[in-house]
Amino acid sequence: MKRLHVHVGVNDLDQSIRFYSTLFGSEPTVLKPDYAKWMLDDPRVNFAISQGNHAKKGIEHLGIQAESTDELSDVYDRLKAADRPVLEEGRTTCCYAKSEKSWISDPDGVVWEAFYTD
Protein backbone atom coordinates (compact mmCIF):
# COMPACT_ATOMS: atom_id res chain seq x y z
CA MET A 1 0.00 0.00 0.00
CA LYS A 2 1.31 3.42 -0.91
CA ARG A 3 2.05 6.10 1.66
CA LEU A 4 1.47 9.85 1.24
CA HIS A 5 4.64 11.94 1.64
CA VAL A 6 4.59 15.57 2.79
CA HIS A 7 7.74 17.68 3.22
CA VAL A 8 7.44 21.04 5.00
CA GLY A 9 10.17 23.69 5.22
CA VAL A 10 10.30 25.28 8.69
CA ASN A 11 11.98 28.28 10.33
CA ASP A 12 12.68 26.68 13.73
CA LEU A 13 13.35 22.93 13.61
CA ASP A 14 13.28 22.32 17.39
CA GLN A 15 10.00 24.19 17.85
CA SER A 16 8.47 22.35 14.88
CA ILE A 17 9.66 18.96 16.18
CA ARG A 18 7.93 19.64 19.50
CA PHE A 19 4.74 20.72 17.71
CA TYR A 20 4.55 17.78 15.30
CA SER A 21 5.58 15.24 17.96
CA THR A 22 2.67 16.45 20.07
CA LEU A 23 0.30 16.53 17.10
CA PHE A 24 1.21 13.00 15.98
CA GLY A 25 1.67 11.57 19.50
CA SER A 26 5.04 10.23 18.35
CA GLU A 27 8.70 11.23 18.24
CA PRO A 28 10.47 11.44 14.86
CA THR A 29 11.78 8.17 13.41
CA VAL A 30 14.68 10.07 11.78
CA LEU A 31 16.30 13.07 13.44
CA LYS A 32 19.21 15.04 11.95
CA PRO A 33 20.55 18.55 12.66
CA ASP A 34 18.47 20.04 9.81
CA TYR A 35 15.78 17.39 9.29
CA ALA A 36 13.16 15.25 11.04
CA LYS A 37 10.83 12.57 9.69
CA TRP A 38 7.84 10.70 11.09
CA MET A 39 6.77 7.41 9.44
CA LEU A 40 3.19 7.18 10.65
CA ASP A 41 0.66 4.40 10.19
CA ASP A 42 -2.35 6.45 11.32
CA PRO A 43 -2.60 8.47 9.17
CA ARG A 44 -0.41 6.52 6.74
CA VAL A 45 2.05 9.28 5.90
CA ASN A 46 5.78 9.93 5.60
CA PHE A 47 5.90 13.44 7.08
CA ALA A 48 9.22 15.32 6.94
CA ILE A 49 10.37 18.78 7.98
CA SER A 50 13.64 20.56 7.24
CA GLN A 51 15.32 23.84 8.08
CA GLY A 52 17.94 25.75 6.14
CA ASN A 53 18.53 27.80 3.02
CA HIS A 54 17.62 24.81 0.83
CA ALA A 55 14.15 24.53 2.33
CA LYS A 56 11.23 26.53 1.01
CA LYS A 57 9.06 27.56 3.96
CA GLY A 58 5.68 25.85 3.99
CA ILE A 59 4.90 22.94 1.68
CA GLU A 60 8.17 22.08 -0.02
CA HIS A 61 6.74 19.14 -1.96
CA LEU A 62 4.24 16.30 -1.76
CA GLY A 63 4.93 12.73 -2.71
CA ILE A 64 3.80 9.17 -3.13
CA GLN A 65 6.07 6.63 -1.46
CA ALA A 66 5.80 3.22 -3.11
CA GLU A 67 6.47 0.11 -1.06
CA SER A 68 7.94 -1.92 -3.93
CA THR A 69 9.66 -1.33 -7.25
CA ASP A 70 6.59 -2.74 -9.03
CA GLU A 71 4.35 -0.25 -7.24
CA LEU A 72 6.79 2.56 -8.14
CA SER A 73 6.61 1.48 -11.78
CA ASP A 74 2.80 1.78 -11.67
CA VAL A 75 3.01 5.27 -10.12
CA TYR A 76 5.65 6.29 -12.69
CA ASP A 77 3.35 5.16 -15.53
CA ARG A 78 0.66 7.47 -14.14
CA LEU A 79 3.14 10.36 -13.99
CA LYS A 80 3.97 9.86 -17.67
CA ALA A 81 0.25 9.71 -18.53
CA ALA A 82 -0.39 13.05 -16.77
CA ASP A 83 0.89 14.96 -19.83
CA ARG A 84 3.40 17.00 -17.82
CA PRO A 85 7.22 16.94 -17.95
CA VAL A 86 8.71 14.27 -15.66
CA LEU A 87 12.17 14.66 -14.14
CA GLU A 88 13.66 11.19 -13.79
CA GLU A 89 16.17 11.49 -10.97
CA GLY A 90 16.78 7.75 -10.77
CA ARG A 91 18.84 6.24 -7.96
CA THR A 92 19.94 8.89 -5.44
CA THR A 93 20.59 9.64 -1.80
CA CYS A 94 18.23 12.22 -0.36
CA CYS A 95 16.84 12.98 3.09
CA TYR A 96 19.36 10.54 4.59
CA ALA A 97 18.01 7.58 2.58
CA LYS A 98 18.79 5.82 -0.71
CA SER A 99 15.85 6.02 -3.11
CA GLU A 100 14.73 5.66 -6.71
CA LYS A 101 12.68 8.72 -7.64
CA SER A 102 11.00 10.91 -10.23
CA TRP A 103 9.44 14.37 -9.98
CA ILE A 104 6.51 16.15 -11.63
CA SER A 105 4.72 19.49 -11.08
CA ASP A 106 0.98 19.95 -11.26
CA PRO A 107 -0.44 22.68 -13.55
CA ASP A 108 -0.13 25.23 -10.71
CA GLY A 109 3.47 24.34 -9.87
CA VAL A 110 2.93 22.08 -6.85
CA VAL A 111 5.84 19.63 -6.93
CA TRP A 112 5.18 15.89 -6.49
CA GLU A 113 7.81 13.22 -5.86
CA ALA A 114 7.29 9.53 -6.64
CA PHE A 115 9.83 7.30 -4.92
CA TYR A 116 10.81 3.93 -3.49
CA THR A 117 13.27 3.71 -0.59
CA ASP A 118 15.13 0.49 0.15
Predicted features along the sequence, with ranges:
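Short, charged/polar surface micro-motifs in flexible loops or helix N-caps
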Residues: D42-N46, H54-K57, E67-L72
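Short aromatic/hydrophobic contact patches that present stacked aromatics
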Residues: H5-H7, K37, H61-G63, K101-W103
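Core segments of cupin and vicinal oxygen chelate
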Residues: K2, H7-N46
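Short acidic/glycine-enriched loop/turn segments that link adjacent beta-strands
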Residues: K32-Y35, K56, C95-E100
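Short beta->alpha transition motifs characteristic of CBS
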Residues: V6, S50, Y96-K98, W103, ...
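Vicinal oxygen chelate
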Residues: L13, I64-V111
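Conserved catalytic-core motifs of GNAT/GCN5-like acyltransferases
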Residues: E27-P33, R91-T93, Y116-D118
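A short linear hydrophobic-aromatic micro-motif
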Residues: E27, F47-A48, P85-E89
